[in-house]
Every structure is written in C-alpha cells, then in structure tokens.
C-alpha cells in the first residue's frame, strides 16, 4: 500500500497525474512538466513535498551526537539557521543528505529524503547515546515549497512577517501564514529563491489553497515531482539514489563544501573522506552535453577513449537550456572540461562533451 500525503484528497481537483516515488503516491505533474518548470523559473510554483521525513533531535547531548554523524560542522549553526549536511558510513558511502534546522539550544529538526526516513531514523537510533531524544514527526508534518522569483511577493500577501528580512538558509517558527501556524524557511530545491513551509498535516490543504489563490494573478502553478526533478537537475542539486548513494561519497559528488575533514572529534567516515580529499576522489560528478542526437538517462554507460569510464546519474532535455544534458559519475582522469566522451544510448555510442556545472544559475536580484 503506497503512502499518501495530507494533500492527496485535493490532487484530483488540480488535475494531478500520480506516480509511485519512494513508497509514496505522488503527483508527477498537474499541467505539464515543461509548463510547471517554466512557471518556477519565471514566476513561481507550489510543490507538495510532505513525503520528506522530519526527525527531531533533542537533549543536552544533541550537538556532540550530531557532530559524530554529520559531515558538516553543526557547531556553526545558530537558532534560526539551516545547514546542508550529509551522513556517511565508515567507508564514506552516503547514508543520506539532509537539512538541519536549529530550533533552540538543544533542539534540532532534521529533514531527510522520503525513501530514507526509516533507514535514517534507525541509523540515528543506533548511534544515539547519553542525553539524546529522537522523534520521527514525519506523519504529522506537512511540507509545501513555494519556489520562484515571485515567491516572496505571493507569500507576503498571506503573512505579517517581513519575508524580505529572512535570509537564505534561515527560518522562523510559529509564523501565521493564512492563519496557519507555520515554520517558514528560505530554502528550496529548484535553483530559485523560495520558501519551504512546514505545518501540521491537518492544516496542509488550507495552506495549499490559500497560496494558490494568492498566487493566481502571478501565474503560480501547482507543480509535481517531474518539474522538481528537472529544476534541481539544471541547478545541479543532488538526488539521493542518483548522484548520492551508499557507494558514492560526498566528495565524488562534488559536495566538499559540506564536508569538514578537520573536524574534532571525527565523524563517521571522516578518515576515508580525508584520504579522498588529499589524494583526490577516484571518481567525479561532471556535466555532459550531447553532441550527437540523443538524451542521456540514469544508468547509461559513459566511455572515454573506448574504455568504460562511468555512468549517467541524471539526464534529460533541459527545459531552460533546450539542450540534451546529463550529470555523470566518471573516473577522475577523464573528468576535465572539454573532454570528449561517448554515452551508450540503446546500444549506440553517441558523442558528448564534459561541460561546466551548474547548468543553470539564477541571476542575483
């Protein structure tokens, strides 16, 4: 039986086409992936991401506990700030990538990938000791993401909080949005400005409908996971199971900014990551652009000078750039920009070239 989010009852009203994703029945699109993608790049779009996992970590031992598990330096957080980080196993394979919200002195909220929630909770529980309390609040929490250049203007109609004062990777809890008590976070997964809004599950429909009503004149569209994927891909934001996995390290995925190999005491996987940092990771995530006609897809093999060199992690025809592009994990020695490679597309080796990433970066307003 697939899980459903608190917004499932209103999907049909907005024309949702649903698919299975990580054990959930989720909307892949409402109008079309291209339309929704372009709405977010030029106006704004509203996503239901209530399938994501939320885990609370509390108690006097919270900080040392998180420091032991996280690749980033959690001590740098302050109440009201958000940090991107990862958890690794001893061999530096990625357990998950996540966001940490510091709510109070010994009070943290971890937001993890939907398909990994149970695995992550078990991993955290296995390593918890001392004064640490863990609580999985995913079932009672809804999460909506309003993303795009018009996001602030639209959301401001529904709240007295001055949204312009909220910096990226900051949040405020207990904010009334359309009379719904909400945690408002300036974060997202699209490469655009935007907000992620956490509320009680029973308030999700009220909040969803209020935002779409407030955004009607700005052309805000309900958006599905299809556009979420093309948007995050153009911005080169990793997706667990594709750019990250138990066999892909954060350094191979190009996430060195979130890996603090000098941290003391060391975190799980730190020794291997330190070696990778010093020697250079054996593989690197690169951007590829097709020269021949064809679309690189997840799992397609990549060749360089006739030898197998890696595989495509994500690929599509970019709605913004109108090019056939992909991300690929390849041997470090063939990862140079300008390197010509071949992608095996249905038995044919088609030419591509390694290009700079991210493919898309929004202009700073």
Swiss-Prot record:
InterPro entries: GCS_T (IPR006223), GCS_T_bac (IPR022903), GCST_C (IPR013977), GCV_T_N (IPR006222), GcvT/YgfZ/DmdA (IPR028896), GcvT/YgfZ_C (IPR029043), TrmE/GcvT_dom1 (IPR027266). It catalyses: N(6)-[(R)-S(8)-aminomethyldihydrolipoyl]-L-lysyl-[protein] + (6S)-5,6,7,8-tetrahydrofolate = N(6)-[(R)-dihydrolipoyl]-L-lysyl-[protein] + (6R)-5,10-methylene-5,6,7,8-tetrahydrofolate + NH4(+). Keywords: Aminotransferase, Transferase. SUPFAM superfamilies: Aminomethyltransferase beta-barrel domain (SSF101790), Folate-binding domain (SSF103025). Its EC number is 2.1.2.10. Pfam families: GCV_T, GCV_T_C. GO terms for cellular component: cytosol; glycine cleavage complex. It comes from the Bacteria. The keyword Transferase applies. Disulfide bonds: none annotated. The keyword Transferase applies. GO terms for biological process: glycine decarboxylation via glycine cleavage system. One of its GO terms (molecular function) is transaminase activity. HAMAP family: GcvT (MF_00259). The glycine cleavage system is composed of four proteins: P, T, L and H. The glycine cleavage system catalyzes the degradation of glycine. Belongs to the GcvT family. NCBIfam families: gcvT, PRK00389.1. This is Aminomethyltransferase. It comes from Geobacillus thermodenitrificans (strain NG80-2).
């Amino acid at each position: 039986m697939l899980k459903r989010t608190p917004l499932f009852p209103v999907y049909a009203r907005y024309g949702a086409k649903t698919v299975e994703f990580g054990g959930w029945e989720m909307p892949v699109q409402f109008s079309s992936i291209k339309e929704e993608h372009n709405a977010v790049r030029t106006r704004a779009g509203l996503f239901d991401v209530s399938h994501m996992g939320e885990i609370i970590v509390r108690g006097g031992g919270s900080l040392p506990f998180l420091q032991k598990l996280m690749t980033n330096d959690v001590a740098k957080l302050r109440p009201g700030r958000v940090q991107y980080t990862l958890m690794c196993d001893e061999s530096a394979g990625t357990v998950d990538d996540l966001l940490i919200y510091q709510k109070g002195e010994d009070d943290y909220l971890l937001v993890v990938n939907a398909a990994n929630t149970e695995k992550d909770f078990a991993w955290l529980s296995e390593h918890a000791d001392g004064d640490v309390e863990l609580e999985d609040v995913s079932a009672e929490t809804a999460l909506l993401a309003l993303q795009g250049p018009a996001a602030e203007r639209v959301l401001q109609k529904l709240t007295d909080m001055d949204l312009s004062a909220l910096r990226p990777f900051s949040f405020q809890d207990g904010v009334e949005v359309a009379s719904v008590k909400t945690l408002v976070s300036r974060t997202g997964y699209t490469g655009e400005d935007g907000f992620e809004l956490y509320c009680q599950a029973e308030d999700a429909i009220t909040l969803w409908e209020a935002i779409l009503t407030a955004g009607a004149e700005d052309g805000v569209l309900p958006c599905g996971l299809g556009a979420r994927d093309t948007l995050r891909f153009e911005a080169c934001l990793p997706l667990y199971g594709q750019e990250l996995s138990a066999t892909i390290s954060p350094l191979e995925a190009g996430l060195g900014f979130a890996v603090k190999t000098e941290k003391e005491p060391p975190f799980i996987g730190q020794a291997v990551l330190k070696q990778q940092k010093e020697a250079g990771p054996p593989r690197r995530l690169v951007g590829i652009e097709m020269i021949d006609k064809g679309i690189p897809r997840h799992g397609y093999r990549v060749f360089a000078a006739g030898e197998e060199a890696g595989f495509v992690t994500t690929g599509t025809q970019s709605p913004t750039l109108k090019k056939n592009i992909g991300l690929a994990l390849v041997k470090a020695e063939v990862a140079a920009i300008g390197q010509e490679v071949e992608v095996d597309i249905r038995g044919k080796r088609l030419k591509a070239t390694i290009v700079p990433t991210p493919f898309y970066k929004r202009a700073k307003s």
